[in-house]
């Protein structure tokens, strides 16, 4: 029996309209009642996640910024990791051959240089939004992560440029087909979940986790039971081909799987 359950948000726990379904919320509360610790492992900012948890009346640990921060249920910072200032400075002050927009995250929030209203659709239920600023004036010593948003093929070409410039000084990952992230070295949801597990006196084998994108790869591959969404990025399914694939987030597949796991644990599971 898993003792810790970790959930990606967008494309996994949330439906395509970025809303948490009623069945999913009910199932999460059933897990809590079974003394299974909940953690949400997401690229979203902790300020946004705190608002969402408060609105849903859920108690959970938070792994935010794709592993750059871990917070306890009470809001205490358990772990923090920032980009190397030299890396942040290089990424923010270099000229890259890309049409992608650039976004900076630090403890104050989400910062970008121009209005991009379509990016706010994913945050409509929380009301979280970017702050407009001159990105070149942001202090490099306080950056948690930098994201590029745009066309996937363009981002793939950008990844080559970034990799050539940064080498092993940063971790690059796709959190969605249209979002490439620059993270601190060794920083990912899997490494953060290992820190949290140790804090709770557990091991990763005591965990189950759900995800859909390449930023979930380390987490899904390291836990006792990793489950991939049916709507996952093809690259993730290919790299973790040994893991089971459940249903689509639009059908609240996480809730469907967990209801079966709670009620009929000895019977084979089918996502249909």
UniProtKB/Swiss-Prot annotation:
It comes from the Bacteria. Keywords: Hydrolase, Magnesium, Metal-binding. PROSITE patterns: COF_1 (PS01228), COF_2 (PS01229). InterPro entries: Cof (IPR000150), HAD-like_sf (IPR036412), HAD-SF_hydro_IIB (IPR006379), HAD_sf (IPR023214), HMP-PP_phosphatase (IPR023938). Its EC number is 3.6.1.-. Pfam families: Hydrolase_3. The keyword Hydrolase applies. It catalyses: 4-amino-2-methyl-5-(diphosphooxymethyl)pyrimidine + H2O = 4-amino-2-methyl-5-(phosphooxymethyl)pyrimidine + phosphate + H(+). Its cofactor is Mg(2+). Mg(2+) binds at residues 8, 10, 212. The active site is at 8 (nucleophile). GO terms for molecular function: 4-amino-5-hydroxymethyl-2-methylpyrimidine diphosphatase activity; magnesium ion binding; phosphatase activity. The keyword Protease does not apply. Disulfide bonds: none annotated. HAMAP family: HMP_PP_phosphat. Catalyzes the hydrolysis of 4-amino-2-methyl-5-hydroxymethylpyrimidine pyrophosphate (HMP-PP) to 4-amino-2-methyl-5-hydroxymethylpyrimidine phosphate (HMP-P). Belongs to the HAD-like hydrolase superfamily. Cof family. This is HMP-PP phosphatase. It comes from Enterobacter sp. (strain 638). The gene is cof.
